[in-house]
């Protein structure tokens, strides 16, 4: 199991079996992160959808938005989202990520976690429209939150990493095949976190 002390935060691959993960702790400096946080918070077309869990319908415990450079919808957990046009601000962030990913992303799913009660349950980003072995680029602004992973078969394999404001976290290779991930609720006093997950819809 990976020792948290092994996380260098400089993009060095993290040593988890069946996963390809990279973490850049300070990909954006503090001023950049604060400015992006404020602008995205104020200008995003936020929505809150209903979601079905074990046959029961709930309001999704976070706010979301979808932007893309095309009109292709994105579906997950019974929710179908239709994208807004990619903004100049989001394209600016995407271009920065391209420099270290060599991937042309088409779409960004944005999540706003308003406080510690907002969460995102165990799941994998393995929807058909993402293709095989997708690359997901996750950018965080605002409050820090723990990102949890657990292996699908080897239940004892669990890991968590604190995603800090201004950080960039990649999930690549067979990560979505072998691992689930979540943002869990927390009783700690935390402020708003905005998370952008860039992906390629095919």
Predicted regions and their residues:
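Non-heme Fe(II) oxygenase metal-center motifs and adjacent flexible, charged/small-residue loops
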Residues: 1-202
């Amino acid at each position: 199991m990976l020792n948290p002390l092994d996380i260098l935060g400089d993009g060095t691959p993290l040593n988890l079996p069946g996963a390809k993960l990279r973490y850049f702790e300070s990909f954006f400096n503090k001023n950049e992160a604060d400015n992006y946080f404020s602008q995205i918070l104020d200008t995003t077309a936020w929505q809150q959808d209903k979601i079905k869990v074990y046959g029961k319908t709930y309001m999704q415990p976070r706010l979301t938005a979808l932007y893309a450079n095309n009109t292709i919808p994105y579906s997950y957990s019974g929710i179908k989202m239709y994208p807004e046009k990619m903004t100049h601000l989001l394209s600016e962030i995407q271009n920065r990520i391209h420099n270290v990913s060599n991937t042309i992303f088409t779409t960004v799913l944005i999540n706003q976690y308003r406080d510690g009660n907002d969460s995102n349950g165990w799941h994998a980003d393995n929807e058909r429209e993402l293709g095989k072995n997708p690359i997901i680029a996750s950018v965080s602004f605002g409050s820090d939150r723990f990102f949890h992973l657990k292996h699908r078969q080897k239940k004892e394999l669990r890991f968590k990493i604190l995603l800090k404001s201004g950080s960039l976290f990649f999930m690549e290779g067979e990560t979505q095949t072998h691992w689930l991930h979540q943002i869990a609720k927390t009783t700690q006093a935390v402020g708003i976190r905005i998370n952008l997950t860039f992906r390629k819809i095919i």
